A protein has these predicted regions:
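A charge-rich, low-complexity, intrinsically flexible signal that marks solvent-exposed coils, linkers
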Residues: 1-143
């Protein structure tokens, strides 16, 4: 049985070791997990797009599923910012800092693009300061 910790739509990034190493990105939507196979994983540089191959939807139980050949690389929730027939723009909120991506349809397949984070991005404003450490300035001329 699957227990949900939040009302926000969930995501999971599975790492597969067989039959060949790849990742699966799964986004909760309308009671299922929409899924894309990522042969090279999530992009880490906005200048580099990664192939994302749409695969059949999975049951929500896959949010917590792992076995000898499949492990959970990351999990959390996601928020959609924009969508049309050719693209989905969203932020993943997982174990790392939030990251905004665009899934871009290229015909039969998709490209996954890491977007540059903007200071005025509401996700950054809400979550971007979690590693901020305030500091005090001191007068170095005082003895």
């Amino acid at each position: 049985m699957l227990y949900r910790m939040t009302d926000r739509p969930a995501f999971v990034l599975h790492e597969h070791r067989r039959p060949h190493h790849h990742f699966d990105l799964r986004l909760e939507e309308n009671g299922v997990l929409r899924s894309w196979a990522l042969p090279k994983g999530l992009p880490t540089d906005p200048a580099e797009n990664r192939l994302a191959v749409a695969v059949p939807d999975h049951d929500l139980e896959h949010l917590t599923y792992a076995d000898a050949d499949k492990s959970i690389a990351d999990t959390g929730w996601w928020e959609e910012h924009d969508r049309n027939e050719r693209r989905i723009v969203f932020t993943l909120h997982g174990s790392r800092d939030p990251a905004r991506y665009a899934l871009i349809r290229t015909g039969r397949d998709w490209l996954l693009h890491l977007m540059k984070t903007r200071v005025d991005d509401p996700a950054w404003v809400r979550n971007g300061f979690r590693h901020f450490r305030p500091f005090l300035t001191t007068d170095t001329t005082a003895v």
